[in-house]
């Protein structure tokens, strides 16, 4: 009698478990037209977290390109830092092959020693 009840349990379990073809057809329905998944459908983990934050206009891991500013005293380029100073590299001119490196300290905006572009250090919190 136990053997019969065990067989019934196995049969019920098989009926509740989706088959491979059922799972595949469900996945295909979620893919973009043509059967290739979009980035949103395929992204997982940190990549998905970054994509969702970017949609909201956030950059929690500071991986996106910084927003360009005029570089004037009134509108300096903002440089995020977790400390009170940071080393900055300025290319100065578009076709320049060298980088001018200098220390940027917390406080007022500072100028590049070569071209005069203004930079300002701003506090940045690390994503935890």
UniProtKB/Swiss-Prot annotation:
Protein's UniProt name: Cytochrome c oxidase subunit 5B, mitochondrial
Keywords recorded for this protein, A-Z: Acetylation, Membrane, Metal-binding, Mitochondrion, Mitochondrion inner membrane, Transit peptide, Zinc
UniProt GO cellular component terms: mitochondrial inner membrane; respiratory chain complex IV
Tissue expression as described in the entry: Expressed in testis. Not expressed in brain, heart, liver, kidney, spleen, lung, duodenum, muscle, epididymis, vagina, uterus and ovary.
Domain of life: Eukaryota
UniProt modified residues of type N6-acetyllysine: 67, 85, 120
Function: This protein is one of the nuclear-coded polypeptide chains of cytochrome c oxidase, the terminal oxidase in mitochondrial electron transport.
